[in-house]
Amino acid sequence: MTLQEEIIRQLGVKASIDPKEEIRKTVDFLKTYLRKHSFLKTYVLGISGGQDSTLAGKLAQMAIAELREETGDQAYQFIAVRLPYGVQADEADAQKALAFIMPDQTLTINIKAAVDGQVAALQEAGIEISDFNKGNIKARQRMISQYAIAGQMAGAVIGTDHAAENITGFFTKFGDGGADILPLFRLNKRQGKALLKVLGADAALYEKVPTADLEDQKPGLADEVALGVTYQDIDDYLEGKLISKVAQATIEKWWHKGQHKRHLPITIFDDFWK
């Protein structure tokens, strides 16, 4: 088995999908998880205005609405959370995503004070934080807020990790990589876009340039620039297609580099890192 085949197997990616079937499968998955855990009544998800959180949010709201209808239990709620650092440059996109999702509840937690306070405390201790590291603090602070909400609201935190993100390790360890449930796992970027099209999302929500937008000194840095490879190449690779040797080497480099992010903390029994 080639490395490409092994990665595809691990991430469960299909070469082609039926978007309607995947929508139904995902909604049922989200419903089943809450039914299985009767002490949970809500899903919590940060909404940025990008493709991934828009899709995960819409599917979560659909699942919650069906659960309420099927059980008559109005305690089932989907809580969308805006988590800007100060003023978000593409706030209009986030509002457009919320209008599409129509969440039961929307909360806004501005993380700037918490992040800046942490950076200042570290500086007082003699630790200068790089812009890149500060970006990871932002991602982790967003998850602190989401878990605080979930803890108070009998909730589970939804993550937006999908195959094209997982393969490159393009997420913050214990930040956006830390969640309770990953409804988009198995889908690549273009497949997620296909689901949003079927769901009737405004094209602007899935055609915009993907960006983590975590670094102050590189605002709106495109994912593809940061990774050095296009999502088209990543998606093709995940669908078992041939791509250029340069693109393949870049993707596989990121796969190996990000292995530690795909595991629980390393124990003496682990050998994947050797």
From Swiss-Prot:
GO terms of molecular function: ATP binding; glutaminase activity; metal ion binding; NAD+ synthase (glutamine-hydrolyzing) activity; NAD+ synthase activity
Amino acids binding Mg(2+): D52, E165
Catalysis: reaction(s): deamido-NAD(+) + NH4(+) + ATP = AMP + diphosphate + NAD(+) + H(+)
GO biological processes: NAD biosynthetic process
Binding residue positions for deamido-NAD(+): R140, K173, D180, H260, K261
Pathway: Cofactor biosynthesis; NAD(+) biosynthesis; NAD(+) from deamido-NAD(+) (ammonia route): step 1/1
Pfam family, one: NAD_synthase
GO CC term, one of those recorded: cytoplasm
Subunit structure: Homodimer.
Family affiliation: Belongs to the NAD synthetase family.
Protein name: NH(3)-dependent NAD(+) synthetase
Gene source species: Streptococcus pyogenes serotype M18 (strain MGAS8232)
Source taxonomy: Bacteria, Bacillati, Bacillota, Bacilli, Lactobacillales
Gene name as annotated: nadE
